[in-house]
């Protein structure tokens, strides 16, 4: 059981790192869209924000599973 818990913690860590990368990309793209005034690029950020929201939910689910054990 302990090894399963450790594996879930490892998965949580990997998901958090992935989300951190998504945040970095989103911030960079936002800055570029603002600096260039590129409306298309700004609209494309909605997709990135959706990915972040989905990743957040995934992380929340992992955390809930860990807490319920």
Locate predicted features:
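Cytosolic, long alpha-helical scaffolding segments
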Residues: 1-69
């Amino acid at each position: 059981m302990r090894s399963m818990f450790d594996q879930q913690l490892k998965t949580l860590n990997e998901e958090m790192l992935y989300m951190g990368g998504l945040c970095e990309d989103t911030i960079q793209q936002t800055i570029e869209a603002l600096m260039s005034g590129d409306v298309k690029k700004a609209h494309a950020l909605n997709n990135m924000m959706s990915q972040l929201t989905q990743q957040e939910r995934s992380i929340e689910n992992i955390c809930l599973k860990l807490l319920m054990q």
